[in-house]
Amino acid sequence: MVLDEYMWMVIVGFIIAFVLAFSVGANDVANSFGTAVGSGVVTLRQACILASIFETIGSVLLGAKVGETIRKGIIDVNLYNNTVDLLMAGEVSAMVGSAVWQLIASFLKLPVSGTHCIVGATIGFSLVAVGAHSVQWMQLVKIVASWFISPLLSGLMSGALFLMIKFFILNKEDPVPNGLKALPVFYAATIGINVFSILFTGAPLLGLQTFPVWATALLSVGIAIVFALVVWFFVCPWMKKKIASRLKKEGALSRISEESLDKIQDEDTSVFKELPGAKGNDESVLPLTSSSPDAAVSSESVSNGNTRVPYGRAASMTNGSIRSPFSNGTFNFDGHTVKSDAHVYHTVHKDSGLYKDLLHNIHLDRVKIDRSAPENNYRILRRNNSYTCYTAAICGVPVHSTFKSSDIAMPEDSEKLVGDTVSFSKKRLRYDSYSSYCNAVAEAEIEAEEGGVEMKLAAELADPNPPQDDSLEEDKEEKDKSQVHLLFHFLQILTACFGSFAHGGNDVSNAIGPLVALWLIYQQGGVMQEASTPVWLLLYGGVGICAGLWVWGRRVIQTMGKDLTPITPSSGFTIELASAFTVVVASNIGLPISTTHCKVGSVVAVGWIRSRKAVDWRLFRNIFLAWFVTVPVAGLFSAGVMAILQYGILPYV
C-alpha cells in the first residue's frame, strides 16, 4: 500500500514528537535528579549536563524494547487493517494529547507519569476511531492500581531503609566508623540493582535481550561484589582521610573565629562593654530594639509597665543568661511603628555567624555620625535561613532595605513590607544548619492595619514550660553532618546517573513510541510494524528530552527536590535506591508500577520519617489529583484532535 498522500501526517508527527519529547524532559527527568539537586550534591546545571548524557545513552541502548509495548500493547492494531490512515491520525492525536497535558503539568510544577499520559491519549483516539472494543481495558485497570501500589510499596521500602541508616549511622555520635563499614554494601546494592535493571530490560543494540533471568541475576551479583571489594580496599581509606582532613579544617576555622571574636571583645569599646554576655557566657539573649535609635540611651515605659530596652541592655538576668521581656508595646521597624503582644526571647550563641553579624550591625549603628539618613546595607532576610522576622526584630535589621513599590518583585520566599501594607505569603518553615545555634522556633503573623503594621511574634524559648514535642529533634535531623554528607555525596550522584540512564530507556518510548509507529506504518504500508525501531529515531527522542530538561526542567525538579520535603544526601540516596529496587522487583513479578509514583512515594515517606512537619501535604494532594486526572485529560485532548482529523480533514485529503 502506497501512503505518499499521507506524507504530511509524518511531517506533522515529527514536529509534535519533538514537542512531546520536550514535555517528557521538562517533567519526567525530575525523577532522576530532583532529589540530587534538592540535597545540594549537584547544582542544577550539573544535573542537566549529567542527565543529558545518561538520558541520551539510555534512550539509544534501552529504548527500542520498551517502545514495543507503547506501540502494540494498549490497543488492538489489527482493527485498523483496512483503515491505516485512521491509525496514523490516531498516533498524531496521541502525541498531541500527551504533550499538552505534560506541558500543563510542568507549568504547574506537578510530576506526572509520562507512561500514563501516552496510555490515556492512545485510549482516547481509539475510542473515537473504532470504539470501546478496540481498547485493552486491563491495561487501564493496571494503571489505576499503580496509583496506589507504586507510592505505597516504594514508600515502605524507602522508609525501612532510611530507618536502618538512621539507627546505625545518622544517630551515632560519630557516624564515620559505621558509615565506612556500610559504604561497600551501599555501592554494591546500587550497582547490582541498576545493572540487573538494565540487563533485565534488555538492550537490543548490545544483544542483551536474550539473557535468561538467572544469568542476569548472577552477573549482577558478581559485578556488585567486585565493586564492593574495590570500595572497601580503595575508596574507604581515601574517604576516611578526606573526612579527617575536613574535620581538622573545620576545627581550625572554629578556633580562629573564636580567637578573633575574643580579641575584638577585649577591646575597650562601649559597644562590647554594653553587650549582654559579651564576656564569660556562651550564650546571650538579646532584647528587642527600642522604638528609635535616638531612644537607645534611655529607657522608656510601655503601656503595660515593662521597660523598653535599648541595644545591649537587659532587664533581668537568670542563670547567666540575660533576658528582656517585651510585651504589648511598640518598637520601630525601619521607620514603621510595629506592635507586639508576645514575649520574645532569642538565644544567640557566640560561635555562630549570626551572633557576629549582630555585633557588627550594632557596632555600625553605634558609630554612625549622620543619623538623619540611615542606610540599610543588610542582606535581604530570606525565610529559608536563620534570618527570620524575629531576628529582624531583635537586632533592628529590616526585612528589606527599602519599602518602595518597586520592591514587590522580590524572591517569592522573602517576606516583603511595602509602605504601610504587608505582602506576606505563609509557607512551611524550613530549618537549616543555623538551627543548632538558634534553638527557638518563631512564627510570625503579619497583618495590615490602618495606621501601621501589626506583627505578632512568639518564641518557644521564652516559655518556661515549653511543649514536649520533637521540634528540636527535627531541627537536628534537617541537615546531615559534614561526615555523613561526604559519605553519601557520590553515592547519590551515582544512583541519580543510573536512574537517568534507565529513565532514558523507559521514557523515550513515551515520547517517540507513536512516532515510531507512524514511521513504520508509512514505510511498510501496514499496521503490524514488524521492523525494529530505528536508532536515529531513539536519538531524536533523546535530544528532545534533553532540550525540555534544559529549558523547563527546573520547575518539576524544584517540586521533587525542595518543595515536597527538604532532602539531604543520606535521605536522597535512600529515596533513589529504594525506588529503583521497587521498580525492578515490581516489574519482575508483574505488579503495575510507575517510576514517577515510586519516586514521589519515597520522597514523602522519608520526609515524614525525618520530620512529621517536613512534608507539604497540600502539594502531595495536588500531585495525587494530577495523577488521577492524567489518563482522562490526556484522553480528552487526544480524542478532540482525533475527531477533528477524522471528520474534518481526512475526508477531504
Curated annotation (Swiss-Prot):
Residues 275-310 are annotated as: Disordered. It is found in: Cell membrane; Apical cell membrane. The chain crosses the membrane at residues 6-26, 47-67, 87-107, 110-130, 143-163, 188-208, 218-238, 484-504, 533-553, 573-587, 595-610, 623-643. It is a multi-pass membrane protein. Residues 290-303 have a biased composition (Low complexity). Residues 27-46, 108-109, 164-187, 239-483, 554-572, 611-622 are cytoplasmic. Residues 1-5, 68-86, 131-142, 209-217, 505-532, 588-594, 644-653 are extracellular. Pfam families: PHO4 (PF01384). Its main location: membrane. InterPro entries: Phos_transporter. GO terms for cellular component: apical plasma membrane; brush border membrane; plasma membrane. GO terms for biological process: phosphate ion transmembrane transport. Glycans are attached at N81. It catalyses: 2 Na(+)(out) + phosphate(out) = 2 Na(+)(in) + phosphate(in). Sodium-phosphate symporter which preferentially transports the monovalent form of phosphate with a stoichiometry of two sodium ions per phosphate ion. PANTHER family: PHOSPHATE TRANSPORTER, SODIUM-DEPENDENT PHOSPHATE TRANSPORTER 2. Homodimer. Belongs to the inorganic phosphate transporter (PiT) (TC 2.A.20) family. This is Sodium-dependent phosphate transporter 2. It comes from Xenopus laevis (African clawed frog). The gene is slc20a2.
